[in-house]
Structure formats: structure tokens, C-alpha cells
Amino acid sequence: MKGIFNAKIAAEFTPPKTWVLQKPLSFSTRLLAKNEVNLLRQIGVNVSSHKSLVMGKVTCVEGMQTDLASVPRIVWAVISPWDVARAAVIHDHLYASLRKYFHSFNSRKSEWRRARKLSDNIFLWGMQSAEP
């Protein structure tokens, strides 16, 4: 397991395709290096680290809007969006922070690529840690 979620998703559907978190959702992993935690903080991600545990925790706040996993229905037999929904919510938070930061500060493309790759890795670790 690459990490652990704090809870199951508690979200309310708001048409046409948005869900609103009813309580915070976190993903903790030991795979984040200190410089990666710092990069996530820099772009505005709600991330904390625990020195004693050498662990990073990304948290989505209550009220955050998400589309969950935008998985086409035809692919559900292979990858159900419900199996990876928590990872998708974390990924949505990461990408929303990423877009907001880079549109506001026009940062270098190398930072953008590094932050995007890290966000995608966290999504992958979350999917690998998913339980239906």
C-alpha cells in the first residue's frame, strides 16, 4: 500500500456533474520527500508533514467541489470510478491548486511540470491504495 485515506467519501451530488464534500478527506503517504511537501505547500495545496512519521498528508476541506473520476461509463467494467473516487478527489484538489498558483504567478514551466508529475504520482499512489 502506497498510502492511507482517513475515511470514505461523504459527498452530496449537485447536478449536472459536481459533488461537494460533506467532510474533509485526507491521503497520507510516506513517499513524499521534504522538497516535494514544500513544492505542494508553495502551490497552495493543503499538505502537512509529520517529522516523527516522515509522512506527508494532503487534505481536501469540507465544501470542496469535485467531479470525482471523470471515467467514461463504457470503461467502468475495467476501472470503476467508485474504486478510485477518493484518489480522484485528492487529485482534483492538487490540480485546482496547481492551476490557481500558476495562473496567478506565471511560474516557470519546469516548476509546472514537476508539480504536475508529483500530483499525478499522488493520484497513482491513491489509486494503488484504493479499496472499493
Residue ranges and their predicted role:
Residues 1-132:
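Extended terminal accessory/targeting regions
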